[in-house]
């Protein structure tokens, strides 16, 4: 298809630039910013005629070892990959309907290791970005503050809807703390996470968006 040709052309250019450095890349997703028919912007080319058509899109690439590892895991579990995309693309398609994409909004999927960002404007997804800080930073702050292992820190996060949180530290001592105190101890880590994500949004968008949507387990804190 027209879009696929464009994405493959971008991949060829990327491979040519990185032949002697990072190896090959796989295109794992793309989104159309706009179609042009005879240099006029159009929502869809289907059913239209003209002398000149073009497409502007964003294509996302991952190093081949990363993609091959994903396929290897699926193969070991007897599963088959039918399609591959990025988390922010999937989240944006589910959560932000096309009519809302007319507004300049950012969607942030806060996972464990990364926070993936997608930005929409004028009906299209216009940028992607990634912050390398996410939910694990909160877990690590709990580990440092309360001298617990990773699994216990995760359990404490999951118990934070209760009025008090009970846990056992690495020395075997039992503790019970107020949930308000627990959240207060995490404010520095949460502020740092929010600041990092905000910087990446502004860098990708060029300015602060009209609204920010948060999804993913890390956003629940």
Give residue spans per PLM region.
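Phosphate-binding glycine-rich/basic clefts of nucleotide- and phosphate-handling proteins
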Residues: 28, 59, 64-72, 120-211, ...
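Gly/Thr-rich phosphate-binding beta-strand-loop-beta motif of the actin/hexokinase/Hsp70
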Residues: 98-128, 142
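Nucleotide/phosphate-binding catalytic cleft detector across ATP-hydrolyzing
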Residues: 1-105, 162-169, 176-186, 204-211
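Short C-terminal domain-edge/linker segments immediately following a structured domain
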Residues: 5-6, 88-90, 114-116, 137-139, ...
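Short His-Asn-centered micro-motif
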Residues: 87, 110, 215-217
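Short hydrophobic/aromatic-rich motifs at helix boundaries and adjacent loops
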Residues: 41-44, 110-113, 169-172, 196
């Amino acid at each position: 298809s027209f879009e696929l040709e464009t994405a493959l052309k971008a991949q060829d250019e990327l491979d040519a630039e990185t032949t002697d450095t990072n190896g090959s890349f796989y295109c794992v997703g793309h989104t159309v910013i706009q179609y042009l028919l005879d240099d006029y912007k159009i929502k869809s080319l289907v059913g239209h005629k003209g002398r000149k058509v073009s497409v502007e899109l964003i294509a996302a690439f991952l190093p081949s070892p990363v993609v091959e590892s994903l396929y290897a895991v699926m193969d070991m579990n007897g599963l088959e990959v039918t399609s591959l995309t990025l988390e922010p693309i999937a989240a944006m398609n589910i959560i932000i309907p096309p009519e809302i994409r007319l507004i300049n909004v950012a969607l942030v999927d806060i996972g464990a290791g990364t926070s993936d960002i997608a930005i929409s404007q004028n009906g299209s997804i216009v940028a992607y970005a990634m912050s390398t800080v996410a939910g694990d930073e909160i877990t690590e702050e709990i580990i440092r503050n309360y001298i617990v292992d990773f699994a216990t820190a995760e359990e404490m996060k999951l118990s934070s809807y209760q009025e008090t949180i009970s846990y056992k530290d690495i020395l075997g001592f039992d503790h019970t703390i107020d949930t308000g105190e627990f959240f207060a101890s995490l404010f520095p880590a949460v502020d740092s996470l929010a600041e990092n994500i905000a910087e990446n949004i502004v860098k990708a968008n060029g300015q602060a968006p009209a609204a920010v949507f948060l999804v993913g387990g890390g956003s629940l804190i």
